């Protein structure tokens, strides 16, 4: 009982200390009482001044031997061990500690905010007892206790620092809840308004339907009355015709009767005849006098018909004179322009002549390209094929490609470029990478397969990531990096290959992939138009039909460009419109992906048209390349040089130039358009990357 009273006295100050907020005096009292506990409690809980060795004396009995787990022997041993363990009692020291801990926990006041800290205090005291009693393990136990105390202090400090964040989160949660409730109330109000509007519209529709039904009935009634009136009119018309016929017959009968009853002419009165003759003679005399007077008065008068003819002739001559004057003035202006052009041509001729003299004086001799025949693999025959139709600059590129191909073949490994931000994602690797050494044909076929898969892909990912994923799917994860380096080095080298050059431009971000895709769509559309004309499916059409299809498919091309395309397919001065053309061969590609001259000419014209369009845009902006141009000015300039451009294309061009989503382009908000700006040079470079082209003619057709 004395021990119990003493332990109760220990527990009461603990509650008061925790509730007091932890003042220095309270902490000192707590330390003193804790030291008293440490002095008294071990004396009470020990057995004769010595600690109980439990359960150390049972350790020798708990050694496991290699036995079968399910055998009878193992079961018997397990039962005997359980009986022995149940017969062994706990040490008195351990029991007193457990009773003390249980009573201390029952005496705690857990209704306060610091209940968990109060609950931890008895365990801390028990641990202090262990530290004081077990002298051998005191350093280790003290370090464990200190580590836990430091961790608890750190956690408390962290909880205290997170309290403002918790309050802020609660406040934000309340604000968001209020906003959600407000939005829901607003939505409910809008829904009610829409429902009312819907009911009003339904009522209006019912009213209109009733009016429609009444009007239909009225129209039907009017049609019936019109039919009745028409029948009555027909009846009256027939009756009128009958009456007219009867009336004519009666009149003829009356005339016949009057002729039968009329006396002869000679039965007239002679006096009346004499008087009538006299009056007739007077009228004749008066008429002759008037005729003579008119002849005398109109002797010098010109007939009106002749006057009108002369006036008409005079007007025609006057118009011809005005036309000739205008033609003369126009010819005079053209003559002056030709004189100026002649003078400028003379100046250019002199300038070119001087430049020619300077070039002839300073330039080196023209290289003898036939020396390359013995160096290039394949001999003179292959060199003739490579050099056909190429100038010196292009021949240098061909020679560099052949030399580079040989050097590329000699390499067994490529050095890894590392993991820098400037390195493309598909080339980020550290260490040597094996050169797969594919042929040019294999690289071209691989690029074609990549384009096919890219076009068929629904969810678009960045092109470099797609390229590397494609290689992983094709060659596996282990060989994907080696193929990436190999293909990259090949497409970087073979710039004369059309498909490699385009793939390299898209891969390095110099062109958008829409340029290549739209080019293929244009060729497919042209082939479809040619197939529609070839009704017999013979694979050939006339030159005239081909020219007509080119003009309808490319309405914005000039006559000179159409003529260039015609020459690319074999049109010459001696050709006839009836000559047949095998149009299918125009779209063929060789095994290295090289297109026919017709497709190459189309691509060259596309590039030149794009450059001309961007140059016209630059001239129309009339700004320095490093100056900023607003979205408003860019939009107005695009509409000036391309008036027929639709809103979708305009949004796409502005989105590409200013790098904002097409749906976010503020076409209707001029204030926002005046805020968004970018450098002219940057905008033109971005438009040059995309499929930028003229939509319609510069000046729209007035008839359209």
Curated annotation (Swiss-Prot):
Keyword Flavoprotein set for record: no
Predominant cellular place of this UniProt entry's protein: cytoplasm
Annotated spans, Disordered: 1-37
GO BP annotations, alphabetical order: cell differentiation; spermatogenesis
Stretches of the chain forming a coiled coil according to its record: 190-230, 304-342
Compartment(s) of residence: Cytoplasm, Perinuclear region
Subunit structure as annotated in this protein's UniProt entry: Interacts with TSNAX.
Record protein name field: Translin-associated factor X-interacting protein 1
